[in-house]
Amino acid sequence: TYKNIPISVISTGIGCPSAAMVIQDLGKINCNYLIRVGTAGSCSAEIKPGDNVIGTGAVRDEGLTSKFLPLKYPAVSDIDVTNALLQASQKNSITVHKGIIHTSDAFNSPDLPADIETAKQAGIKAFEMEASAVMMIGALNNIKTGCILSIDGYVMNISEGNVKPDSKACAEGLSGAIQSALDSFLILNSNDS
């Protein structure tokens, strides 16, 4: 529990397939809310290591979700969960950015530099590996979902072979993301009362 509210913390592993399996099981036990807390790489040098990104939706650049619904169906987070994450982050004085994120199966693909350029032009905030499944499979199982990510570095550095994650900043950002997620559940619980 967190401040007398029952909360479960679950590791799904890496990628959409394992996340989807966990979410489908949560749907069977009447889970109401699900918030993905994790790490991501930013699409812009202005979004720095340790900053948090709240995903409002996700590009479905992975192989799992199209097995459930066609690509024309968007992966979006629940507005109430997103607003609770924003409110909690503001209360906790967390540096946060909100917007679309890019879920991908492969960060080291030859297409990465072009994908990053397109993402920057489209205002994509970050690249990660699970959010589209969390949002879509959650929606299919009547679970309201959200996503908050701590930035560990700039994605373009990966394609240039210059990976220099800022572990200290990312850990601080992740701590803030966890606190914001926990406080979001308090907000959502009070809204449901």
Indicate where each model-derived feature is located.
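His/Asp/Glu-rich mid-to-C-terminal helical/loop segments that flank catalytic regions of hydrolases
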Residues: N157-S193
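Active-site rim beta-loop-alpha module in soluble metabolic enzymes
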Residues: K72-A122
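Zn-dependent metallopeptidase/amidohydrolase metal-coordination segment
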Residues: S132-A169
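Short glycine/serine/threonine-rich phosphate/pyrophosphate-binding segments
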Residues: P17-A20, M129-V134
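Metabolite-binding pocket within alpha/beta catalytic cores that recognizes anionic/polar moieties
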Residues: T1-N83
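Short acidic/polar active-site loop segments enriched in Thr and Asp
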Residues: N32-Y33, K125, K144
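Generic non-transmembrane alpha-helical segments
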Residues: A84-N92, I137, S180-L188
